[in-house]
């Protein structure tokens, strides 16, 4: 039985067209930065923007919507949207910087997915417009390309709901998806303004404050400085950055409850509680067992756990870290922070669900026959299906991680550093052991691109896309 046919592809194409229009609008915005700083590369942004707007308009207008939007369509749209966004960003960098496609695609996929890995050894030599493009891509990608477009271009209804779920989001702040997305938007914008103001109060220049807020709140982590946040040598800047990383890694539902004054609900959120516990435990382990300085420890633990990838240490300093500290950070990068936030990786709720599932199974075996044991997390009932789904996803996650790690090791990179790099790419983190570079061979570079893409979409949608395309074309 075929589950996807040509009619489904028409529906996917129609909604993909809307996303392409949104991407075209986003990549045109750095033109204003280019004008302000007198850069003569306007056509590098304008032409790709018009390509995206034009192609999107054609698909949206002429593709018939032959069936109602279902989750499979949303997943396929999301997968293709991230690829298209990376492609359009690549065209800009190829034109503006005269670099090859693979490096341009890597940089843009890293930015859009909030991974934060960069092929540039000296970002300070890049045009201001390109730096802003990277920051803007991370800020948009932090929410999700599809989520952003739902809030602006797609009318409320079933289609919006299916597309919302396609980017691994399921929480609802408001009864309708449209109002949920708008609320998320306003929270995100409010925190963005707050971040810019706080950075400004530390004495940071406006351009730096804008870019650092966009990248750290979105848990993207790319910097406009070669030394990342370490460039500023300021405790105040470090504190603001840690605050933004934690805000970015916290569920938007918790932010909404905080804004509404529901402090009891905030304090009893299990993901927030687990975040505090993990930050405390991993920092203590890094300081007292790994022998790493306290500030360096807590900063990078928060950076890794929130999947931001911001750093206050140079790459050579990070490569020289004790193996124990690298293992601590790898663990953080695998776990991530809250579902329903801008963070990547497995996410705390899945880890808790699986651990609780194991505990409940042990207690079921030990309990008297006929006993009924309540299974709840944060007051919500947890089904066998949810436990299996969490376990299955974590299993898939480690299979992909092993694949990426194997590719890097085969190319001669240190096994521990390769695991660090693979976990960073797949968790959309951005901390690097220096493996990612302009001269990284094509095969490991493509493996990291695939890992970033799959990690951002949480694997299943990509499998749905591949299966769907195969079925549709087999059907003729």
Language model feature labels by segment:
Residues 1-476:
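Membrane-proximal intracellular helices of multi-pass ion channels
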């Amino acid at each position: 039985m075929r589950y996807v046919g040509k009619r489904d592809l028409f529906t996917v194409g129609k909604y993909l067209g809307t996303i392409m229009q949104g991407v075209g609008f986003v990549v045109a915005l750095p033109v204003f930065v280019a004008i302000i700083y007198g850069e003569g590369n306007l056509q590098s942004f304008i032409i790709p923007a018009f390509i995206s707007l034009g192609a999107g308009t054609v698909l949206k207008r002429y593709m018939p919507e032959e069936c109602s939007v279902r989750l499979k369509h949303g997943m396929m749209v999301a997968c293709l949207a991230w690829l298209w966004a990376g492609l359009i960003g690549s065209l800009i960098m190829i034109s503006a910087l005269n670099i090859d496609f693979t490096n341009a695609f890597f940089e843009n996929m890293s930015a859009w997915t909030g991974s934060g890995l960069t092929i540039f050894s000296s970002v300070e030599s890049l045009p201001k417009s390109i730096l802003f493009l990277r920051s803007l891509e991370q800020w948009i990608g932090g929410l999700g390309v599809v989520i952003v477009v739902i809030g602006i271009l797609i009318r409320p209804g079933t289609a919006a709901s299916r597309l919302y779920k396609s980017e691994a989001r399921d929480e609802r702040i408001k009864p309708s998806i449209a109002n949920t997305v708008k609320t998320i938007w306003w929270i995100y914008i409010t925190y963005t303004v707050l971040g810019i103001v706080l950075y400004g109060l530390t004495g940071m220049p406006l351009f730096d404050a804008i870019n650092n807020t966009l990248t750290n709140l979105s848990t993207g982590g790319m910097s406009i400085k070669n030394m990342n946040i370490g460039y500023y040598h300021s405790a105040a800047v470090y504190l603001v950055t840690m605050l933004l990383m934690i805000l970015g890694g916290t569920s938007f539902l918790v932010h909404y409850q905080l804004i509404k004054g529901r402090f009891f609900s905030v304090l009893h959120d299990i993901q927030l509680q687990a975040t505090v516990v993990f930050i405390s435990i991993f920092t203590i382990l890094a300081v007292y067992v790994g022998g790493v300085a306290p500030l360096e420890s807590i900063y990078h633990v928060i950076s890794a756990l929130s999947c931001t990838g911001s750093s206050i240490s140079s790459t050579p300093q990070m490569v020289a870290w004790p193996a124990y500290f690298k293992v601590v950070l790898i663990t953080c990068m695998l776990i991530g922070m809250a579902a329903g936030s801008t963070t990547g990786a497995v996410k705390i709720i899945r880890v808790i669900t699986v651990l609780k599932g194991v505990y409940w199974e042990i207690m079921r075996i030990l309990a008297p026959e006929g006993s009924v044991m309540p299974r709840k997390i944060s007051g919500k009932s947890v089904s066998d299906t949810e436990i299996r789904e969490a376990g299955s996803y974590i299993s898939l996650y480690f299979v992909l991680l092993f694949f990426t790690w194997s590719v890097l090791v085969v190319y001669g990179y240190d096994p521990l550093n390769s695991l660090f790099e693979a976990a960073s790419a797949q968790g959309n983190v951005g901390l690097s052991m220096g493996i990612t570079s302009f001269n990284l061979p094509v095969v490991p570079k493509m493996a990291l691109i695939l890992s970033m893409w799959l990690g951002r979409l949480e694997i299943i949608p990509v499998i749905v896309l591949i299966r769907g395309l195969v079925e549709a074309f087999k059907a003729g």
